[in-house]
């Protein structure tokens, strides 16, 4: 069954939340000049907060050993002993991080269950399969879908890249939309002037602050302040520019 990758929405659809998944994580929605991405939450997040992805399992993300497989194969078998829940990495990514095929990335369709055992089989969601044969020398990493179980951007413990802003309160374990482009409301840290670039705050969870080129806070901009200066601790109009 095919799912649309981009939805043409109506005003207000960005505020819809559900406890059951309605779209593939990462599905895009456009409403006039605003763009959104479909995500789930790992904690309750109120409206206007910047969201980041969760950390995931570091031991699965790099240097996993594999069994040999031919070009065109649609499965990769992990040869090391691991504990992996069934389909934990569905709609996530398999990357080759080192040796020969390094730099390649594949979408994951699903994975088998293993508990302190070898032989986890990862099925890739690409009909042409692997672009080249792999040997036992290759090293891979597994990543869950970045839009799965997001959390408010943590000022003191950044786990992942920023994903977008909530448009309404989203309960823990629920599904909803994050604004990634266009105008939206955001929690403000400090008093950024009108039109200045903004970064994720390093002092207030889920907030944005002014980009400080000459200071110590030189993170990549995630948006721009709107037509008036922001007020510390309040929500202001910003132009999101994450994607």
Give the positions of each predicted feature.
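Extracellular receptor-binding modules and their adjoining Ser/Thr/Gly/Asp/Asn-rich linkers
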Residues: 1-86, 98-243
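Short conserved beta-strand and strand-loop elements enriched in small hydrophobics
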Residues: 91-98
């Amino acid at each position: 069954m095919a799912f649309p990758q981009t939805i043409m929405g109506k005003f207000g659809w960005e505020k819809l939340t559900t406890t059951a998944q309605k779209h593939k994580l990462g599905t895009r929605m456009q409403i006039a000049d605003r763009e959104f991405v479909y995500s789930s939450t790992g904690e309750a997040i109120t409206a206007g907060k910047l969201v980041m992805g969760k950390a995931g399992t570091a031991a699965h993300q790099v240097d996993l050993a594999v069994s040999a497989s031919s070009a065109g194969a649609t499965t990769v078998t992990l040869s090391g002993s691991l504990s992996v829940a069934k389909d934990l990495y569905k709609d996530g990514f398999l990357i080759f991080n080192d040796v020969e095929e390094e730099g390649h990335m594949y979408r994951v369709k699903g994975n088998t269950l293993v508990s302190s055992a070898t032989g986890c089989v990862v099925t890739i969601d690409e009909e042409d399969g692997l672009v080249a044969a792999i040997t036992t020398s290759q090293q891979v990493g597994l990543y869950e879908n970045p839009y799965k179980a997001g959390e408010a951007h943590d000022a003191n413990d950044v786990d992942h890249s920023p994903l977008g802003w909530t448009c309404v309160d989203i309960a823990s374990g629920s599904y909803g939309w994050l604004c990634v482009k266009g105008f939206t409301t955001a929690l403000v840290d400090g008093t950024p002037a009108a039109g200045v670039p903004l970064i994720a705050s390093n002092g207030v969870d889920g907030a944005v602050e002014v980009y400080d080129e000459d200071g110590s806070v030189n993170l990549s901009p995630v948006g721009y302040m709107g037509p008036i200066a922001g007020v510390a601790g309040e929500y202001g109009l910003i132009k999101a520019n994450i994607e």
